[in-house]
Structure formats: C-alpha cells, structure tokens
C-alpha cells in the first residue's frame, strides 16, 4: 500500500493550541527513537539510532496521559477525512527528535516497526511543527541470519497523514 498523505488534516487554530501545549507536557528520555530499545536491529544500512523524548498518550489500548483529551479530536478529523471510523487506538505518543550532530553522515534514523506484536493496524503520523528531514516508510524488514535477506514480515499496513505546519 502506498502511504496516503493528507494536507492540513486539522484546523490551524487547533494545531496552534497543540503546539503551545507540547512543551508544557512531561517528556521522558529514550536512548532510541524506535518503538523500543529492543527492536530488531538493521544491518547493511547506514542509519542513525538517535535519542529522543516522548510522552505516551495511549499505551496498549489504555489512556496513559491526562492530556489525551486534547489530542483525541485528531481522530475525529481523521475519520471524517478517510470516511472510516477509528475503532481502537493501540498506542498514541508524542515524540521530540533532536538533530544529531553527525546526522549528515547517515541516510535515515533507525528503522523500526511501530507495533511489532500486532497485525492489521494503521499508523497515523502527524507533524505539528516543521521537520528538518524526510520520513522513510519501509514495507518489509530482514533478519540478519537469513543469508538471502528474504522478507520476514510485510509491514506495509500504514497510512501516513502529514499536517503542513
């Protein structure tokens, strides 16, 4: 499936409110910006395993933040746009990624699978502010132990929505 890009998913005034709120929330350090620090390692590609900070809104289907109410309306705009209901939210998080001083020596940040223990889900990526780089979407990953590098799992189950700041 080709990622779907939706420009201006949320109204500008709502986007501004979310941006203003971001830096009032508690963010927590992570030594790896992938799904978790134990995610599958990538081999043969020059990638950056960058640090970051995140704030969990929903984890394993449960509300994990007192601020979820502020971000939940994004799903209403999404449902209206794609003309499908959002039935379940497995995980929602806010992420702050920093420019690594050696970023020009790398092609992209560490590849990862958003929810490696789940099947048949969609991913929403919403940028609330300007990003200095591209988002790379991969449709498969490889196991380092496979000599041929054949595909282990197809992860092309995502729809990507980009909010133009």
Functional labels for PLM-detected ranges:
Residues 65-165:
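Catalytic core of non-heme Fe(II) oxygenases with the double-stranded beta-helix
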């Amino acid at each position: 499936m080709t990622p779907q890009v939706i420009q201006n998913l949320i109204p500008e005034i709502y986007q501004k409110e979310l941006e203003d709120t971001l830096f009032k929330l508690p963010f927590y350090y992570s030594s790896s910006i992938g799904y978790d620090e134990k995610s599958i390692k990538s081999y043969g590609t020059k990638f950056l395993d960058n640090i970051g900070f995140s704030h969990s809104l929903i984890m394993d289907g449960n509300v994990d933040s007192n601020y979820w109410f502020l971000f939940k309306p994004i799903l209403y705009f999404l449902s209206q746009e794609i003309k499908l209901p959002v039935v379940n939210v497995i995980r929602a998080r806010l992420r702050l990624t920093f420019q690594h001083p050696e970023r020009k020596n790398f092609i992209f940040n560490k590849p990862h699978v958003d929810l490696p223990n789940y099947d048949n889900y969609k991913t929403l990526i919403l940028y609330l502010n300007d990003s200095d780089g591209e988002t790379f979407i991969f449709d498969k990953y490889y196991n380092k132990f496979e000599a041929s590098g054949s595909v282990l799992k197809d992860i092309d189950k995502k729809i990507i929505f980009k909010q133009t700041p």
